[in-house]
């Protein structure tokens, strides 16, 4: 199982050719389970499309790729023969949502207000740096994500904004004090993922084990935010073998 940004690829960019070929080989031997705070569409852009276009991954191989979006609160798997497909060609419509645990409108509003007000309190609400059409706080259905510079900011700017995580740790701490029923975890380069308490990556990994009928000892996890407060840390706490990259 893998985190995505800073683990498989540079933040917010598609996986490189070398990684696409490596994952293609792994799909012949293992069940591959990326788990991230990203929304489903980003999994397609950053991973699936690259596997198909660069590494010529087949629908049969994709049946072994399990996408756990929004920290694992959404799970998608590929059905090669769905929609009258004979299984010989890839069709994006054949991704099936197995489950989803969406936030209510009221929960989204509470989290959004807590993140925005906390960032403004400490001077880290940088709306003036957004590109046209971009936003700092994004509703990802089962999760709300704060991206300090927006989704469209350049990679260099993102890396430079909070390399030691101190800005986001402070925002997350303040937001948690405002709405204690929710969790706030640092992720990626400029992000904070917010969700109901307990619906972190350990929730996703537990569902992964249930869906694939495997035990903790069967899993090897790769991630970059394995420190306390990072969004990979709950996996470490579960006792799953973890490699920090």
Question: Model-found features: residue ranges?
Answer:
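Conserved phosphate-coupling serine/threonine residues in phosphotransfer and NTP-handling enzymes
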Residues: 36-38, 205, 223
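Short loop/turn segments at strand-loop or loop-helix junctions that form parts
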Residues: 1-5, 69-73, 78-80, 140-141, ...
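A short, Lys/Arg-enriched amphipathic alpha-helix followed by its capping loop at the start of a domain
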Residues: 1-2, 18-30, 178, 211, ...
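Asp-based, Mg2+/Mn2+-dependent phosphohydrolase catalytic module
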Residues: 210-216, 227-245
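Asp-based phosphoryl-transfer active-site loop
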Residues: 1-13, 34, 67, 205, ...
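Active-site phosphate-binding/coordination module
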Residues: 14-133
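Conserved acidic, metal-coordinating active-site core of Asp-based
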Residues: 124-220, 231
